[in-house]
A protein has these predicted regions:
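Active-site ExK catalytic segment of metal-dependent nucleases
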Residues: 141, 151-163
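Accessory nucleic acid-recognition modules appended to NTPase machines
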Residues: 1-140, 144-147
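Catalytic cores of nucleic-acid endonucleases
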Residues: 158-180
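Hydrophobic/aromatic beta-strand patches that form the interior of the parallel beta-sheet core
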Residues: 81, 153-155, 178-180
Length: 180
């Protein structure tokens, strides 16, 4: 089933991806996985139609990418998230990943959904979609700029209490006003 394969492949992308996509877009990354692992007769157009349908149906959502914590470097559709945490958990389980990995991705997905809500009316944060950022060779799970106050926040989704070196450096270099 094409959609089942797309769901599972999207879950794999969520698991492996920490710096954006290898390909130029989520659809190219997804197509390469689906074609390689499931069916070589699926065209790019067919994969794009399936992705568009899933997005319009509210099943998946996209996050952008900010290079160097620069709000002006926004690149759309750099990462995909499921719009339902039950789907997220189900398809991550189908990939065979560990419970710890599932919990980490579900936590990040939850934050994505909350940030997405804050972009909708009444708008609280900037950008078209929630976005992650890169800083050197590292990733910041989400980078947010408030509409009111214009403050920037580097958000790291963790299950523990320790802050990462990357977050401290981002704050020290004044790439974000606050770290969460």
């Amino acid at each position: 089933d094409t959609y089942e394969n797309i769901f599972t492949s999207a879950a794999r992308i969520l698991l492996k991806e920490k710096k954006g996509l290898d390909a130029d877009s989520f659809s190219e990354e997804l197509q390469s996985i689906v074609v390689k692992e499931y069916s070589s007769n699926l065209s790019k157009a067919a994969v794009n139609r399936a992705i568009d349908w899933l997005h319009r149906a509210g099943i998946i959502g996209f996050a952008g990418k900010l290079t160097g914590c620069d709000i002006l470097s926004y690149k759309a559709k750099a990462r995909v998230f499921f719009m339902d945490l039950g789907l997220t958990t189900y398809f991550l389980t189908q990939t065979g990943c560990t419970p710890g990995d599932i919990q980490g991705v579900v936590n990040e997905n939850f934050v994505f959904l909350d940030l997405r809500r804050r972009i909708l009316f009444p708008r609280e944060i900037a950008l078209e979609t929630p976005a992650f950022a890169t800083w050197g060779n590292y990733e910041i799970d989400f980078y947010v700029k408030s509409i009111k106050g214009q403050h920037t926040y580097a958000v790291e989704v963790k299950s523990g209490k320790n802050s990462s070196w990357t977050m401290e450096e981002v704050l020290e270099k004044k790439k974000a006003d606050y770290i969460l």
